[in-house]
């Protein structure tokens, strides 16, 4: 299954959350798209709730179904911690997500583009794979020429706070994953237990 590339605002309104992280799409129209949008959000069945939560999390991080399920399976093999929390941690450790958390991009989609276009370095070496798994202690930065990108400057100017599991050096324009995130530092809108329930029925 390919990654969804349709209108992100419609997708956000359908799910009822801001997938971009900006909140603009929900602030403008806080109901699902379509002719019956304002009245279309009824009570979901248990199946519907699980599917809704799975799609919400998958689209939030911009993964296709195969990538998403692979990470979920990996998380289940980690002996310590809860399956759902470990899954969330693996999602957060993706390079595109860390770039977003550092404030080098305003959305995960923009962060993914920065990685794909070769602007991002890990420990000084260019890495253009958004799914690259960042380890604690690794330093994420920009290629020297990329430090002048206006979109990066705008993103950094818009930063008001960063999660405490990353640190950032404003002078060097680089940051570090200092530790793994705690559950309360990750997406609060997600109930990952519903995602676990969904896949437990399938796998």
From Swiss-Prot:
The GO biological-process annotations, alphabetized, read as: ribosomal small subunit biogenesis; translation
CDD domains listed in its UniProt record = S4
Q: Show the Pfam families listed in the entry.
A: Ribosomal_S4 (PF00163), S4 (PF01479)
InterPro entries with a match to the protein in the record: Ribosomal_uS4, Ribosomal_uS4_bac-type, Ribosomal_uS4_CS, Ribosomal_uS4_N, S4_RNA-bd, S4_RNA-bd_sf
GO function terms (MF aspect): rRNA binding; structural constituent of ribosome
Q: Which family does it belong to?
A: Belongs to the universal ribosomal protein uS4 family.
The annotated subunit structure for this chain is: Part of the 30S ribosomal subunit. Contacts protein S5. The interaction surface between S4 and S5 is involved in control of translational fidelity.
> Could you tell me which HAMAP family the record lists for this protein?
Ribosomal_uS4_B (MF_01306_B)
In Swiss-Prot or TrEMBL terms, this protein is called: Small ribosomal subunit protein uS4
């Amino acid at each position: 299954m390919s990654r969804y590339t349709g209108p992100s605002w419609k997708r956000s309104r359908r799910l009822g959350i801001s997938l971009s992280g900006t909140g603009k799409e929900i602030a403008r129209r806080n109901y699902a798209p379509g002719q019956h949008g304002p009245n279309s959000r009824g009570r979901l069945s248990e199946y519907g709730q699980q599917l809704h939560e799975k799609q919400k999390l998958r689209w939030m991080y911009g993964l296709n179904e195969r990538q998403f399920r692979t990470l979920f399976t990996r998380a289940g093999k980690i002996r310590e911690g809860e399956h759902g929390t470990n899954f969330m941690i693996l999602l957060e450790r993706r390079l595109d997500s860390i770039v977003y958390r550092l404030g080098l991009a305003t959305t995960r989609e923009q962060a993914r583009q920065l990685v794909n276009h070769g602007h991002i370095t890990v420990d000084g070496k260019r890495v253009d794979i958004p799914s690259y798994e960042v380890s604690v202690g690794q330093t994420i930065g920009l290629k020297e020429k990329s430090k002048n990108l206006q979109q990066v400057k705008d993103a950094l100017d818009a930063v008001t706070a960063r999660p405490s599991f990353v640190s950032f050096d404003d002078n060097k324009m680089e940051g570090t994953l200092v530790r793994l995130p705690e559950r309360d530092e990750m997406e609060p809108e997600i109930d990952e237990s519903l995602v676990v329930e969904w896949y437990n029925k399938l796998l």
